[in-house]
Each structure stands twice: as structure tokens, then as C-alpha cells.
UniProtKB/Swiss-Prot annotation:
It comes from Gallus gallus. This is Endophilin-B1. Gene3D superfamilies: Arfaptin homology (AH) domain/BAR domain (1.20.1270.60), SH3 Domains (2.30.30.40). Pfam families: BAR (PF03114), SH3_9 (PF14604). It is found in: Cytoplasm; Golgi apparatus membrane; Mitochondrion outer membrane. Residues 27-261 form the BAR domain. The gene is SH3GLB1. Residues 306-366 form the SH3 domain.
Length: 366
């Protein structure tokens, strides 16, 4: 029974406090009551925390969009995360494209120029897909998780303490209002005691809130380190992708634009060579780029002269008829041009064997 009486008294006291705060808040909004202002330093800290929260949320959400553009996939990952379960593993976009290219290449025939190139491109796309997964995983751990921890942890604590500070201020100002209205000496003495108590509680809560808010500077320093980790992860990812594409370009070789045209029709537009960014120089130092213009020039000179050149075979090639020469990848043969020959072919010699060979399967040597 005593416990029930205590609970009823506490409930009545809480209701009275809530009503007092509501009245004080309303009168402040109507300009009918004075309001205790926070000191300028605390106001600046509150503003800094709010600004940090807003921009952290925006950066976090946009980073998630960057790493996973598919909104349905993001929603699925969110639900699995809330259920504390691992999302099912699926191919990402580069891996899926790579698989399609490999399947198409095998369907068209690995021995054909197009089929072989599709397979090699598909393998590279799969490598890029793996690098993409590593970027997402590293970025999630080193960048997104710390940002999310701030939003869902530190800032929630700040919000809770800030709300408590607001309530303590309302209690203080309500007590000050009652003191002003007190006429009887006994009531005035009680109101003065209430003001002293609420002032002490307000000052204590203001100090707690201030200490929490001053931690925002440490949060910025921590997020700066996380940002550096994110930049490093991106740099590694783009360097890997560049290296993979440079490897692919080297495997495919750089040939006249007839290789890129349909129905073996010649095109006069030169293929642009890839320029190596200085930031990736270290990643690609061991992979020299083959200049398209040099190769094009070399073949043009060979066709216009009666001389011959050594050439490295890029892929296996099975001769379609007796006028062609079968080739093995990485072997070196002698090539030359004869009058009236199709622009996509050269004559090749290997010992006593000779026959037509497709330009797209060759890399001219100096």
C-alpha cells in the first residue's frame, strides 16, 4: 500500500513538473515570460554538433549510394543488418558483365578474334568486380561504420543530454516566474529555495552537455583519419582497375581501327592511346602501354614497303583454309605485305611454312 502511495505521489509530481514546463514554454513563445539564455560558447558548441550531424548523415548516405547504386540492394542489406543476418552473396555488376562476356566468347568460339577478346575482357571485368567488393568492404569498415557510430551513438547521447538541459532550463525559469509572483514571505522563501535548487541542477546539466559537445573536435579528428582511409581505399581500387585495364589492353594489342569496325570495313579514325595519370605511375610502371599510333604507323610502313618485320602472335589461330597459316600464342613469326592483299591481313612465315595471317592476332616487334 505504501508503495502504491509512493507511486501515485511520484506520478502526480511528474505531471505537475510536465505541466509547469509546458506553461513556461508556451509563455516564452508568446513573449510573456523571460528565458534564460545559454552562454555563447555553449550555443556555438550546440550549433557545431548539429552541423556535424547533418553533414555526416549526408556524406554517409551519399557514400552508400556511391558504393551501392542499386536502392533495392541497399534496402535488402539494411534489413539483413537489422536482422543480424548475412545478406546472400550475389554477383555485382562488373562480375555479371564479365560472366556474360565470357559466355558469349565461348559461344562465338575462343579461336575467333571477337570471341577471344570477349573472354579476356570478361576475365578483366571479373577482376574489377572483385576489386569493387574489396572497396565496399574496406570503406564500410573504415569509413561508413565510424560515421554511423557517431550518428547512432554519440549524437544520440548529445541529443538526450541537450533535452535534459532544456528541461532543467524550463524548470529554472518556471521557478523564477513563481518567485516574481510570490507575495507572501513564506511563499517567497520557498520560491527562492526552489530557484537555488533548479539553478544548481541547470548549471550541472549545462556542464555535462558542454563536456559532451567539446568531444565534437575529437570526432572531427577521428573522422579525418577515417576519410584518409577511404581515400586510400579508393586510390587502391582505381589503381587496381587501371592496372587490370592496362593488362587487358596489352593482351588485346593496339591495332588499326579496322579491328574496331564492323564487317572488316576500314575506318580512318585513330584509336586514342591511354594516358597514364601520375598518381598511378607506380601501379603501372611494370606495364608499358603500347601506343596505337606507333603500331598503326608500323603496319602502314610495312604495307607500303617490300620489307618484312618480326611479329609476336597474341592468340592461337586455326587456319580456315590452305592459304592461311595457323598460329600459336607467343610465337614469333616473320610478316610482310604483298600487293593486292586485304587490309586486315599480312603474309606470315614460320620456317618453310607461310600463309595469310590476321593483323588482329599480331604485335609488331621493333
Amino acid at each position: 500500500m505504501n508503495i502504491m502511495d509512493f507511486n501515485m505521489k511520484k506520478l502526480a509530481a511528474d505531471a505537475g513538473t510536465f505541466l509547469s514546463r509546458a506553461v513556461q514554454f508556451t509563455e516564452e513563445k508568446l513573449g510573456q515570460a523571460e528565458k534564460t539564455e545559454l552562454d555563447a560558447h555553449l550555443e556555438n558548441l550546440l550549433s557545431k554538433a548539429e552541423c556535424t550531424k547533418q553533414w555526416t548523415e549526408k556524406i554517409m548516405k551519399q557514400t552508400e549510394v556511391l558504393l551501392q547504386p542499386n536502392p533495392n540492394a541497399r534496402i535488402e542489406e539494411f534489413f539483413y543488418e537489422k536482422l543480424d543476418r548475412k545478406a546472400p552473396s550475389r554477383m555485382n555488376n562488373p562480375e555479371l558483365l564479365g560472366q556474360y562476356m565470357i559466355d558469349a566468347g565461348n559461344e562465338f568460339g575462343p579461336g575467333t578474334a571477337y570471341g577471344n577478346a570477349l573472354i579476356k575482357c570478361g576475365e578483366t571485368q571479373k577482376q574489377i568486380g572483385t576489386a569493387d567488393r574489396e572497396l565496399i568492404q574496406t570503406s564500410a569498415i573504415n569509413f561508413l561504420t565510424p560515421l554511423r557510430n557517431f550518428i547512432e551513438g554519440d549524437y544520440k547521447t548529445i541529443t538526450k543530454e541537450r533535452k535534459l538541459l532544456q528541461n532543467k532550463r524550463l524548470d529554472l525559469d518556471a521557478a523564477k516566474t513563481r518567485l516574481k509572483k510570490a507575495k507572501v514571505a513564506e511563499a517567497r522563501a520557498a520560491s527562492e529555495q526552489e530557484v537555488r535548487i533548479t539553478q544548481s541542477e541547470f548549471d550541472r546539466q549545462a556542464e555535462i552537455t558542454r563536456l559532451l559537445l567539446e568531444g565534437i573536435s575529437s570526432t572531427h579528428a577521428h573522422h579525418l583519419r577515417c576519410l584518409n582511409d577511404f581515400v586510400e581505399a579508393q586510390m587502391t581500387y582505381y589503381a587496381q582497375c587501371y592496372k587490370y585495364m592496362l593488362d587487358l589492353q596489352k593482351q588485346l594489342g593496339s591495332f588499326p581501327s579496322t579491328f574496331l569496325s564492323n564487317n572488316n570495313q576500314s575506318s580512318s579514325a585513330p584509336v586514342q592511346s591511354v594516358s597514364t595519370p601520375s598518381v598511378l605511375a607506380s601501379a603501372s610502371a611494370s606495364l608499358p602501354s603500347v601506343s596505337n599510333s606507333v603500331v598503326t604507323s608500323g603496319i602502314s610502313e610495312l604495307k607500303s614497303s617490300s620489307g618484312s618485320r618480326k611479329a609476336r602472335v597474341l592468340y592461337d589461330y586455326d587456319a580456315a583454309n590452305s592459304s592461311e597459316l595457323s598460329l600459336l600464342a607467343d610465337e614469333v613469326i616473320t610478316v610482310y605485305s604483298i600487293p593486292g592483299m586485304d587490309s586486315d591481313w599480312l603474309m606470315g612465315e614460320r620456317g618453310n611454312q607461310k600463309g595469310k595471317v590476321p593483323i588482329t592476332y599480331l604485335e609488331l616487334l621493333n
